[in-house]
Amino acid sequence: MAYSYTEKKRIRKDFSKLPDVMDVPYLLAIQLDSYREFLQAGATKEQFRDVGLHAAFKSVFPIISYSGNAALEYVGYRLGEPAFDVKECVLRGVTFAVPLRVKVRLIIFDRESSNKAIKDIKEQEVYMGEIPLMTENGTFIINGTERVIVSQLHRSPGVFFDHDRGKTHSSGKLLYSARIIPYRGSWLDFEFDPKDCVFVRIDRRRKLPASVLLRALGYSTEEILNAFYATNVFHIKGETLNLELVPQRLRGEVASIDIKDGSGKVIVEQGRRITARHINQLEKAGVSQLEVPFDYLIGRTIAKAIVHPATGEIIAECNTELTLDLLAKVAKAQVVRIETLYTNDIDCGPFISDTLKIDNTSNQLEALVEIYRMMRPGEPPTKEAAETLFGNLFFSAERYDLSAVGRMKFNRRIGRTEIEGPGVLSKEDIIDVLKTLVDIRNGKGIVDDIDHLGNRRVRCVGEMAENQFRVGLVRVERAVKERLSMAESEGLMPQDLINAKPVAAAIKEFFGSSQLSQFMDQNNPLSEITHKRRVSALGPGGLTRERAGFEVRDVHPTHYGRVCPIETPEGPNIGLINSLATYARTNKYGFLESPYRVVKDSLVTDEIVFLSAIEEADHVIAQASATLNEKGQLVDELVAVRHLNEFTVKAPEDVTLMDVSPKQVVSVAASLIPFLEHDDANRALMGSNMQRQAVPTLRADKPLVGTGMERNVARDSGVCVVARRGGVIDSVDASRVVVRVADDEVETGEAGVDIYNLTKYTRSNQNTCINQRPLVSKGDVVARGDILADGPSTDMGELALGQNMRVAFMPWNGFNFEDSICLSERVVQEDRFTTIHIQELTCVARDTKLGPEEITADIPNVGEAALNKLDEAGIVYVGAEVQAGDILVGKVTPKGETQLTPEEKLLRAIFGEKASDVKDTSLRVPTGTKGTVIDVQVFTRDGVERDSRALSIEKMQLDQIRKDLNEEFRIVEGATFERLRAALVGAKAEGGPALKKGTEITDDYLDGLERGQWFKLRMADDALNEQLEKAQAYISDRRQLLDDKFEDKKRKLQQGDDLAPGVLKIVKVYLAIKRRIQPGDKMAGRHGNKGVVSVIMPVEDMPHDANGTPVDIVLNPLGVPSRMNVGQILETHLGLAAKGLGEKINRMLEEQRKVAELRKFLHEIYNEIGGREENLDELGDNEILALAKNLRGGVPMATPVFDGAKEREIKAMLKLADLPESGQMRLFDGRTGNQFERPTTVGYMYMLKLNHLVDDKMHARSTGSYSLVTQQPLGGKAQFGGQRFGEMEVWALEAYGAAYTLQEMLTVKSDDVNGRTKMYKNIVDGDHRMEAGMPESFNVLIKEIRSLGIDIELETE
């Protein structure tokens, strides 16, 4: 394999044994593909597929007026261009969206003509609001903030069969039910009650007998019985009664008479139970009629009405039980044939028959009325209303839709072969569902498992947006229908009919405030990627936290390779929010699929198939780690496999599929934990969650021990700058990279220049710092997909969330008790865990009732010192170092007129109006904050004059744009002239500036000319003349194009900003705050080993080894055994080896050894100790040297999950680095110099600093704001509140008998209003006495009691 630009510079030693059959797919595909399908941008009318927006329009249009004389048809839509790009949207606080224009056709029919002749057709494009666009990283910019729409895992539409697990009835009897769930529309439930009758519920309302629904569908009692039951036919001949025998039906019954064959031989004696052997004998004997006594009929149910043969009178209705009286009537009427229902207690219960018996309705109309009463209680039913209501419930495409998925699941579940069909239900569907339910109750078939991933599907962004859009369109439809009747008479255009507000509102509401539209977690690249790959069971149409039981939250066998069993939040959402597995994707129906390799006759092929949970059940699937021989055949006698969702072993020839990779089980975050296989699952869960909280450090440091996934995450997350096309680096500085594209990648007629502007010191959603640093130098050759610049938490294109620290596992004076962490001062000095946080502070000047607020440096009652960081416009300058209380933006607000004294009136009259009628409302730095101003943005309303600061910012931005465009033009021009030079040199000229005819053109001659004069050359070859003309035209076109581009950007910058009503001006100030690590900060490793920094010790006091190297961190060894996350110990050992090898390479470089020696040593590291071999021969000597230089800090290792380094390989690495194979060494106490008595585990562990910083939590209060009713201090840091002295704390003081302290706590330090003001005054006067009064909460209590009508008085003694 060829190495990319960055891989060459630092190759990771890979310990994996298994081959890469399949690359890790693009990690954001689930978001991007879904939304791309929804928009279908760029598709022509013919190319539109029936999904997304197009499908939503088609489902609502055409809209036909109530009279039917006018119709509005949908033709197609197109998306416009966004007004601002992504960065401008974030800056201005607007939504990144495009206008949607829909072409509709208004058709008016001729009223007079009988065959609806068309009278008039009008076509027009109608604006239907803005549709938010997805950025290339799968996020949306809504009102200037980056948001993610999380995918939802919901119950698939279709039919489900279930039982209540015996919980409903006290007897513990299983009550079975069936539920038809549509994509939209009413739910239909069938359920058994304890008496075994079947009931139906519509939309979970009160239940009706199921036969009511069947009657409403038009079935008669007889048809219903025929559909569900077979019949026994009895013939009456005089005094004998013969049964038409179906021997199978007798099984399990007790013979009430002797059963004989044709010859009179007794096959079954009276009183014996009939078995399968007896039935075989009966079938052999060919007995077709069986004589039975008349009382055999008693208690049986009639299947067909019994009619008097002579008179035609009905003797007994069908579904009536035969009694002695009835039999007498039948005998009297000389009926010759009776049909009864065949039922038994084992596999054919009388459920439907019993249900019909409790059903009070007798015909279709009564049934419809009954359903109408249930759906609309209290309304008087009419025949039409009842029919319409029932028809609309399940049989109208407007109100009911199973969707393609629902129809597929429905048909598969009830055993049909075809998977396509109508979206509405049919009579047959309902009958089939009932049949299946009755079969399950009879013991044939099983109930469904609703947690099976074949019954849960993923709804992605596109689908949810489409549903919202349809909701908006349906609202529009109602309004349009009413207006269409006017369209005929008033000659309206389509534009006048459609009001786009409801559509825009529905979309806005979905993206702005839906439960699944979330503020993006932007702590670091991993948290971004994980957020976009999250799958939630919550949200509209999903579960709620309170209702979700254990089963839903649990890991299911079908999660394998689809949903990660490890990564899920701790707390109330556990198991409801999951993460997609690394290789998982959704299929066209929205079910999750996992990839497998095909195995044929125990030979593993490279063919890959994606299977959903349903399709995989019948396969026998081997693990990715199954042993193969050289030919790729399974060799073990028994292979560990998964079959029918169980783990078992099978012979190799039975295996049909094999896993693609061992990491296909886990999610991206879990696959970044090295030695995951040695960690307990609970700790791995914490490890994968805490990696998402790591704050990007000042200097990213790649993990010495990684898993090989780091590069994929960094590349796919979009925080790095990735080359769009290959080429040569033309110029590079801190803020941009310019690439001159290689000739073979340049499309004709475009500039072969790619300019990448880097993001510098920008605030993320979590207030961390986003900053990109270029990796390339001028003249470097890069290919498409190479990484040009690192983003936050990335190091040379690899994810780098923390720092490699030298750790020792030993107790240290109790400073690392209970997971505390003891740090060395060196960590702070080297800024290893220093992070930059950027805060955005906003000052808004509004128009108030008393006049406009003003942003100015002229603030009343403020000293000169407070204003020295402001410019003349009253805004702080960039680069100022500010602390709590400093003014950032000066602002004054007019205050209401107060009654003036005569003296003040006089002063006013003399010195003019404006002296004292304003108050200071400046923006100040909040408490506990100290930092540097790094940027200021000023937004001014249209029509309000811009201040000097706004103008200078605008000028700066214009200069930057101009510089970019000039650079682009310079390169285009340069490239064009280079191509011309290649063509012209050596060719003969006809004439030109200072040139004779027939002279050959040389390089020197061209160098002497100005570039503009080249086009005055006349060449002998006409093709060259044509090339010169084309080049001249091309260059002038480019110039024009770039000028237009500049003017467009300039117009955007100079137009006023769209601010909220009543706002005149907004100033945003960005503060950069540097936070060093300090006691109280939370740190963690990647194995769920978290702790709080307890102390920072001087370097000289830390334990050190025999060479005098001190450790950076001392961790408590007791944190390992009980937590069972041994992975951290293995990581420490391998980290030690990696660092040792780096030091060895460093010594070789310092001793200036030959390249061949270096190459040999690198070969030993990469290719002689297990794992994947690296092809070092393809690197030249200079590249080997560059690689060695980058390895001096340590050789990075990759130990992929479930396929990582073995113990012997770690030992071999330690040996190669000349370190003890135990990974332990003797340490000395830094304070005394004495050796500790036992060897200590020392090595390198990757530590993260989490976003739980003590600076954000530290808080103290003396006096402050009080709650209105109780007059007690508020709580919490945000309210500048106090600490609550609660019930238990009061008990503690009571227990000590500290009466005065307790009184102080409950009165003057809490809610005794007079007491506390008096106390404050006393302290100011130096008198430290207190007088406790009445606590306000006692007064509240008395008022509460009085409000109950109890008079209560306080008596004073």
From Swiss-Prot:
EC annotation from Swiss-Prot or TrEMBL: 2.7.7.6
One Gene Ontology cellular component: DNA-directed RNA polymerase complex
Highest taxon above the source species: Bacteria
GO BP of this protein: DNA-templated transcription
Catalytic activity line of the entry: RNA(n) + a ribonucleoside 5'-triphosphate = RNA(n+1) + diphosphate
Keyword Nucleotidyltransferase (UniProt): yes
CDD domains for the chain: RNA_pol_B_RPB2
Keywords for this protein: DNA-directed RNA polymerase, Nucleotidyltransferase, Transcription, Transferase
UniProt family annotation: Belongs to the RNA polymerase beta chain family.
Quaternary structure annotation from Swiss-Prot or TrEMBL: The RNAP catalytic core consists of 2 alpha, 1 beta, 1 beta' and 1 omega subunit. When a sigma factor is associated with the core the holoenzyme is formed, which can initiate transcription.
Function: DNA-dependent RNA polymerase catalyzes the transcription of DNA into RNA using the four ribonucleoside triphosphates as substrates.
Name the UniProt record assigns to this protein: DNA-directed RNA polymerase subunit beta
